[in-house]
Amino acid sequence: MSNIRRLPFTFLMACSLVAQAAAPQGWFMAGNKPADYETGVDAQAGLNGRPSASLKSKKPAIEGFGTLMQEFKAEQYLGKRVRFSGFVKSEGVQNWAGLWMRVDKGKKTVAFDNMQSRPIKGTTGWQNYEVVLDVPQDATGIFFGILLDGIGSVWLNSANFEIVPTSIPTTGGEPPLPNGPKNLDFSEIR
């Protein structure tokens, strides 16, 4: 293989390693533009002076997203309802940010929520957020994290993953279909 052909692969690997070097232990960077974001741990930036993870854009404009995430086997959560939660603060988020979680069966996603319907935008103080999903009996993997679409900065503190009772509603999935047609005369305006 020529040096020119190796260059793109080597460059991508170097970018990936740089991004991974700053990620907190047990976490990694991903997304469709992970090289456009940086992550790290702010030792005393969290609630009560506790460490928090940060995810920040590195460019003045980004068409895409980055995420700081974890993944693990679903085995011990099969048939359970689970919640990923944490306190998040944001600064200058122009598109949106949010916690997210996905449950897969093989290569197929069977449950998903990324808070896009209730996004974090702009500059906010610490607020508690959560995503809650059911893990089917045949699930194989669980993935979760914090994502930033476009530019800005977000911090995650006091992250928690737990089994919850079914009395706590899920946050993911498609909204239920209405019982019939609506607004056929277009008189209702958002």
Locations of the language-model features?
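Bacterial N-terminal signal peptides
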Residues: P8-V18
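Positively charged n-region of N-terminal signal peptides that target proteins for export
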Residues: M1-R6
